[in-house]
Amino acid sequence: IGEVTSFEACANRDLDLLASIFRFLRMPGGGICYDFGVYYLTAIVSLFGPVDSVVSSVRNLAPKRVNVVPDSPEYGQEFDYSNESQAFTILEMKNGVTGTFCVNGDSTINDQAVFTIYGKKGILKLVDPNNFGGDIVYIPGVKDWTQQAVPEVLDYGFAYSENSRGLGPSEMAEAIAEGRLNRANAKMAYHVLDTIDQIMKSAETGAFEKVPSTCERP
């Protein structure tokens, strides 16, 4: 796709339903960013490297919610939800690329994610980082505006595109044997959480916030 000019990662959930089922989502750290957005931010950092600064709008649309699960003993009862349910963020990466990261927990099930990279020569539509498998679609650029670009589904070029939850420990073992840093390493995980902390801080200050930590792009 040539030089990358921007990216977007957006996803939705239904926290009325999910927080009715999973009580831990009501606890500190169970908000839409910390519980769900980490998958998308980790994918962004894996592709583009560390985040330099962020500016965001974060809110909780419904601090009081009603249990919507008929089988639950709390069905129809009100419960407190004190975490963030929405976050809309501009990410400035250390490599100079800027993109958007948006998560909305006040929507519906099933989750519908958009993860797109825009380049000067084409566009990549990536799979949902919260799921396994899916198609990576390449949309080539056209020079004649009367022509319609023809999307192409790309071959992954490697195995383990489906449910492969043991892949991380397996790659870690290879990294230890080869004397290198594993891809899903602690520094990257810390940087992603640090980025979310600054997203929360930016929503309070109304300004760009630098992300103090950094990491290597895997």
Model-predicted segments: where are they?
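Conserved loop-to-helix N-cap of the C-terminal "lid" that shapes the substrate pocket in Rossmann-like
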Residues: 33-37, 182-190
